[in-house]
Amino acid sequence: MVTYISFIGESQFNFYFASKKFFRLTKYFRDPINSKKFENLIKQAIIRKLPHIVNYISMIIKNNKPEFNNKLFDNLGINEYFRQCVKHNIYNAIDYFVSKDINTVNEYGKTPLITAIKSGNCIMVKKLIDYGADFNKNKIYKLAFDHRHNDIFIFLIDKKIESDKTYNKIRNNFGSICNTNINELVESK
């Protein structure tokens, strides 16, 4: 069964959903840009763990209504939505939010990576680091260790060792290139 629902707001969107859970969200259609945190459509979809709805709303906003995008995400801040996706394991929605700054810090000093570590979500930690989240802070390792998330702690240590090896290779190779060039320069004079 195909259901089309539209809501009245600053823009008129048509949504297609084949989910009965979706109908619980219809009360939030009246004001999709409501500044109250828990009366926001996308926030409710995230909290209720409806990734197909989050993805669909994000896709429509991203592709069709950039001006609506700014109004929707500026009220709570992109980091709040991102943190909620991390907290509720909505992996697919991360692609939308990655286009924003992945290392943004909310008013409590938390980044999405910190939220993923605290929730023990190793898959999300890996995705965030793959997308460029900064993991080179001592606080990150201590946080994983303190919360007893061994899999995350081991992953972070392995990633750190890997990045240090890469850094050392680059530094050592650059140094040997410099030495070669200096010797050539000295010999040429």
Swiss-Prot record:
A Pfam family annotated for this UniProt entry: Ank_2
Assigned keywords, A-Z: ANK repeat
Cell division is among the record's keywords: no
InterPro entries hit by this protein: Ankyrin_rpt, Ankyrin_rpt-contain_sf
Family matches, as Gene3D superfamilies: Ankyrin repeat-containing domain
The keyword Methyltransferase appears for this protein: no
ANK repeat segments: 108-137
UniProt name for this protein: Putative ankyrin repeat protein L38
Source species: Acanthamoeba polyphaga mimivirus (APMV)
